């Protein structure tokens, strides 16, 4: 089985009837409940569980899991990852990408300089940022580069099949 895509985590227990707080990583927090059942990662093992109810609470979300009716039972589920199979994610329009698809891509400049590989992405408010781990023998001594994900301005071409990203970026920066 392919590793599920992590969409959030279960947080602390809420109340005495087995409800749990939910930390959603989806753009619209409630969208995490569009997927049911969930896969959860407990001690490195993914298993399925069903959400029987959910609601907004204050500024967050809480949920009820099938078969979990006591606070003590819910404690075993705190701080576990919530995932779904990748094939359940909606298809994106042309030119849009899931972050998970960009991680691991090789990044090079339009002049052919190999900058390294994408290790993560950051959301900054104004635009997303590629975190690129530099090659061990980088001529500029860089360990990591932060490259703004600005299509057309900086990002020139993305080829997910070849796992490459071409950027207009000064390697010394």
UniProtKB/Swiss-Prot annotation:
GO-annotated biological processes: ribosomal small subunit biogenesis; rRNA processing
GO molecular function, one term: ribosome binding
Keyword rRNA processing: yes
InterPro entries linked: PRC_barrel-like_sf, PRC_RimM, RimM, RimM_N, RimM_N_sf, Transl_B-barrel_sf
SUPFAM superfamilies (alphabetical): PRC-barrel domain (SSF50346), Translation proteins (SSF50447)
Domain of life according to the entry: Bacteria
Keywords per UniProt: Chaperone, Cytoplasm, Ribosome biogenesis, rRNA processing
UniProt-annotated location(s): Cytoplasm
Domain PRC barrel: 94-173
Keyword Metal-binding applies: no
GO annotations of cellular component type: cytoplasm; ribosome
The protein's assembly and partners: Binds ribosomal protein uS19.
Family: Belongs to the RimM family.
Annotated domain remarks: The PRC barrel domain binds ribosomal protein uS19.
The protein's role, per its UniProt record: An accessory protein needed during the final step in the assembly of 30S ribosomal subunit, possibly for assembly of the head region. Essential for efficient processing of 16S rRNA. May be needed both before and after RbfA during the maturation of 16S rRNA. It has affinity for free ribosomal 30S subunits but not for 70S ribosomes.
Name of this chain's protein: Ribosome maturation factor RimM
Lineage: Bacteria, Pseudomonadati, Pseudomonadota, Gammaproteobacteria, Aeromonadales
């Amino acid at each position: 089985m392919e590793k599920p895509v992590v969409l959030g985590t279960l947080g602390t227990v809420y109340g005495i009837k087995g409800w749990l707080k939910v930390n959603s990583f989806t753009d619209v927090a409630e969208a995490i409940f569009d997927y049911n059942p969930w896969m959860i990662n407990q001690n490195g093992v993914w298993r399925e569980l069903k959400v029987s109810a959910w609601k907004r609470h204050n500024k967050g979300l809480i949920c009820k899991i099938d078969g979990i009716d006591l606070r003590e039972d819910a404690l075993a589920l705190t701080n576990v990852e919530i995932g779904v199979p990748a094939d359940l994610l909606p298809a994106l329009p042309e030119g849009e990408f899931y972050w998970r698809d960009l991680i691991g891509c090789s990044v090079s400049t339009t002049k052919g300089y190999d900058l390294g590989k994408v290790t993560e992405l950051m959301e900054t408010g104004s635009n997303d940022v590629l975190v690129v781990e530099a090659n061990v023998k980088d001529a500029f001594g860089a360990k990591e580069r932060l490259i703004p994900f600005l299509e057309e301005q900086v990002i020139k071409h993305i080829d997910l099949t070849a796992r490459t990203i071409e950027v207009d970026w000064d390697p010394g920066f």
